[in-house]
């Protein structure tokens, strides 16, 4: 079930899923991309805007050791653009 526009939902993003796939020196940048993909998939959003605090939390312990899981609050809004239909935008902040 998709999140309705205007709703806020808390997700726990399992960042540890990428640890075996990605080399140590790429973990934090890949973790940011994983958060973006995870939220886009679960919120059914075309655009995901991540708060700088979420980025700082991922990078807090350096490039090699991102947190194994991260609780984030996601707010979904719909916006009309010229020449297009409505676009779903997900805003991600720390929970």
Curated annotation (Swiss-Prot):
Keywords: Ribonucleoprotein, Ribosomal protein. The keyword Ribosomal protein applies. SUPFAM superfamilies: Ribosomal protein L31e. One of its GO terms (biological process) is cytoplasmic translation. Disulfide bonds: none annotated. GO terms for molecular function: structural constituent of ribosome. InterPro entries: Ribosomal_eL31, Ribosomal_eL31_CS, Ribosomal_eL31_dom_sf. It holds the Pfam family Ribosomal_L31e. GO terms for cellular component: cytosolic large ribosomal subunit. PANTHER family: 60S RIBOSOMAL PROTEIN L31. Part of the 50S ribosomal subunit. Belongs to the eukaryotic ribosomal protein eL31 family. This is Large ribosomal subunit protein eL31. It comes from Pyrococcus furiosus (strain ATCC 43587 / DSM 3638 / JCM 8422 / Vc1). The gene is rpl31e.
């Amino acid at each position: 079930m998709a999140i309705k526009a205007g709703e806020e939902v808390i997700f726990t993003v399992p960042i540890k899923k990428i640890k075996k796939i990605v080399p140590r020196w790429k973990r934090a940048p890949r973790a940011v991309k994983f958060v973006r993909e995870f939220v886009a998939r679960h919120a059914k959003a075309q655009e995901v805007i991540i708060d700088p605090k979420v980025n700082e939390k991922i990078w807090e312990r350096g490039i090699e050791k991102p947190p194994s899981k991260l609780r984030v609050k996601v707010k979904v809004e719909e916006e009309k653009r010229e020449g297009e239909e409505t676009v779903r935008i997900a805003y991600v902040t720390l929970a």
